Structures are given as C-alpha cells and as structure tokens.
Amino acid sequence: MKTITLNIKGIHCGCCVKSLTQVLTELDGVQSADVQLEGKANITFDENRVNVAQLIEVIEDAGFDATE
C-alpha cells in the first residue's frame, strides 16, 4: 500500500468532501481516502491495482482539479 497527498481545487463545502471521498473509495484499489475541506486528500491505495494518474482522473471527472 502507498499513501499520497494530493492538492485539490474546487472543494467548497462538506458535500464536496463527502462526494469526493465516495468517488475515491469506490475506485478499485483504494483502501482509504481522507478528503479535507482545506483542499488536500490523503489517499491510501494498492499500486498494483490503481495509479496516481487514475486517481487524478477520477477526481477531475468529479469536477475538481488535482495535482501532486
């Protein structure tokens, strides 16, 4: 397992946090996602099942901007 912190733009409220947490944790290979209102997400994932580019893509598909 690997843990990464991503910077996320576009998180404005608790609903954004909940929505993004749900999208990430539903992704195959993600063990946990701690999304913070301050624009950070700590994600623990299995590198053999998902990669950072896929995490960023899912976040962007949900309407947010993400960078490492």
Curated annotation (Swiss-Prot):
Cited CDD domains: HMA
Amino acids binding a metal cation: 13, 16
Record keywords: Metal-binding
GO molecular function: metal ion binding
Superkingdom as given in the UniProt entry: Bacteria
Gene3D superfamilies according to UniProt: 3.30.70.100
Signal peptide limits: none
PROSITE patterns: HMA_1 (PS01047), HMA_2 (PS50846)
HMA domain span: 2-67
SUPFAM superfamilies in UniProt: HMA, heavy metal-associated domain
Protein name: Uncharacterized protein HI_0292
